[in-house]
Swiss-Prot record:
GO terms for cellular component: plasma membrane; respiratory chain complex I. The keyword Cell membrane applies. It comes from Leptospira borgpetersenii serovar Hardjo-bovis (strain JB197). NCBIfam families: nuoB_fam, PRK06411.1, PRK14814.1. The gene is nuoB. The keyword tRNA-binding does not apply. This is NADH-quinone oxidoreductase subunit B.
């Protein structure tokens, strides 16, 4: 058996045994299939997230089985519940500590728009301080809706390049800075 025979495996050509691609497609595949969520739960949406993580819905099937309670080890933050003005700087600091690329899912009516709490102490939407990627409607949203948001984020990650993602986030942050004055704790 010579070197020329190595290119032919029994019943297969060498081209059938190789998977060709570039490094960015491998990174997109990895990012899309292994998200490390940081649940920032402040209200009833946090209880629904717990249901999502349990065996009935099993968030592990979607590659997000390892919740991280350290922002430096997370790449996705789920904002679950009402955010007050006193809590907003803490949430922003947690977001800033996360490694790039980072993703934000706003879960429930309270996180997305302040919900039924239209008061002076409640932030009327987390998108005033963070660049939100996906909104999950509901009060509280069902676990299926949270899983749907996770699948949509994974699809977005698998189809969008890293440079396009970086430009999108920088544009969102610039819009946030132009639209909002510095956040003042009341």
């Amino acid at each position: 058996m010579g070197l020329s025979d190595l290119s032919k495996a029994p019943g297969q050509a060498l081209g059938d045994m190789l998977q060709l691609g570039n490094i960015e497609s491998v990174i997109q595949w990895g990012r899309g299939n292994s998200l490390w969520p940081f649940p920032f739960a402040t209200a009833c949406c946090g209880i629904e997230y717990m249901s999502t993580a349990c065996s009935d819905y099993d968030i592990a099937r979607f590659g997000a089985e390892r919740p991280s309670f350290s922002p430096r080890q997370a790449d996705m933050i789920l904002v679950l519940g009402t955010i007050t003005y006193k809590m907003a700087p803490v949430l922003r600091q947690i977001y800033d500590q996360m490694a790039e690329p980072k993703f934000v899912i706003s879960v429930g009516a309270c996180a997305s728009s302040g919900g039924m709490f239209n008061t002076y102490g409640v932030l009327q939407g987390v998108d005033r301080i963070l660049p939100v990627d996906i909104y999950v409607p509901g009060c509280p949203p069902r676990p299926e809706a949270i899983l749907d948001a996770l699948v949509k984020l994974q699809t977005k990650l698998k189809t969008q390049g890293l440079e396009a993602r970086r430009q999108e986030v920088m544009q969102k942050i610039q819009e946030l800075n132009e639209r909002n004055k510095p956040l003042v704790v009341r």
